[in-house]
């Protein structure tokens, strides 16, 4: 007896939070805003991927630059290893 065809998973695309907020008001990604940046950094200090955060390309790039600048001035930690 033949197998039934597998159902395709429907992936719901996340909307970029910054694009949604920019329509209502001016939103800036600043390296000094560590509470915002910590949402996009894992507990080990790695920058989360776009597919995880749901950001668009431009805002993900802005977050990456802001996190790197924030690390330079010691507001956020660099990537740590588990020991």
Curated annotation (Swiss-Prot):
Disulfide bonds: none annotated. GO terms for molecular function: small ribosomal subunit rRNA binding; structural constituent of ribosome. It comes from the Bacteria. Keywords: Ribonucleoprotein, Ribosomal protein, RNA-binding, rRNA-binding. Gene3D superfamilies: Ribosomal protein S18 (4.10.640.10). One of its GO terms (cellular component) is cytosolic small ribosomal subunit. One of its GO terms (biological process) is translation. Pfam families: Ribosomal_S18 (PF01084). PROSITE patterns: RIBOSOMAL_S18 (PS00057). SUPFAM superfamilies: Ribosomal protein S18. The keyword RNA-binding applies. HAMAP family: Ribosomal_bS18. NCBIfam families: S18 (TIGR00165). Belongs to the bacterial ribosomal protein bS18 family. Part of the 30S ribosomal subunit. Forms a tight heterodimer with protein bS6. Binds as a heterodimer with protein bS6 to the central domain of the 16S rRNA, where it helps stabilize the platform of the 30S subunit. This is Small ribosomal subunit protein bS18A.
